[in-house]
């Protein structure tokens, strides 16, 4: 079978779909902790006591299947970004990135005006997730942000750094505004509501 660009895109979407996890997939001893530290909001996998889960079990030396965190700042330091929060750091085990992103978007929707990707560098894996939000997720809304130069000439309120979007066009083509990294995203709190006693909320 010849692997055309269209077929490759479909395969990538299938992998993302299959790998993505939900609250029902959390191991019995894994929880989700949400807290603020040094002006960042953290969404982190922890144990029942709220202690961070490391990639490797220090007692056994074996890999932990579920670990990681997503953090974001509630406002960009340089640009308004339409009052959206901005991703800061993402480190997460395979298959669990979209789950933590979903929660981060839900929190940012409640507290800010949604969430936008890192404004400078986004990994290829994270870029696929944002593209999936932008094109395939009916439960996630995307809103176009302007660039630092107010290219849309609609005022500065939605101006946002677009370095990651411009970098994206080098690989994927198009204009910076075609990139899924150029937008902010909002989502209803369905994942947060589904966590029940698995959620350790400290905001």
What are these language model-derived features?
Residues 1-18:
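Protein-protein interaction and targeting regions used for scaffolding, dimerization, and localization
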Residues 46-91:
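Conserved donor-binding loop and adjoining core beta-sheet/short helix segment
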Residues 19-38, 44, 65-79, 109-203:
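Terminal substrate-recognition subdomain of acyl/acetyltransferases
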């Amino acid at each position: 079978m010849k692997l055309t660009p269209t077929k490759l895109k479909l395969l990538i979407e299938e992998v993302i779909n299959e790998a993505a996890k939900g609250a029902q997939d959390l191991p019995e001893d894994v929880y989700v902790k949400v807290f603020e530290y040094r002006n960042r909001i953290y969404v982190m996998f922890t144990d029942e006591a709220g202690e961070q889960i490391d990639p490797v079990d220090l007692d056994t030396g074996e890999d932990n299947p579920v670990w990681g965190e997503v953090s974001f700042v509630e406002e960009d330091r340089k640009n308004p970004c339409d009052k959206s929060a901005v991703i800061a750091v993402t480190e997460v085990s395979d298959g669990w990135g979209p789950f933590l992103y979903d929660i981060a978007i839900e929190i940012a929707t409640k507290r800010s005006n949604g969430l936008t990707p890192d404004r400078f560098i986004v990994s290829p894996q994270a870029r696929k997730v944002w593209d999936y939000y932008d094109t395939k997720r009916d439960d996630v809304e995307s809103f176009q942000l302007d660039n630092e130069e107010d290219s849309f000439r609609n005022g500065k309120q939605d101006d946002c750094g677009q370095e990651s979007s411009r970098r994206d066009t080098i690989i994927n083509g198009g204009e910076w505004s075609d990139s899924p990294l150029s937008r902010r995203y909002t989502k209803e709190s369905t994942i947060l509501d589904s966590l029940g006693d698995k959620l350790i909320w400290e905001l």
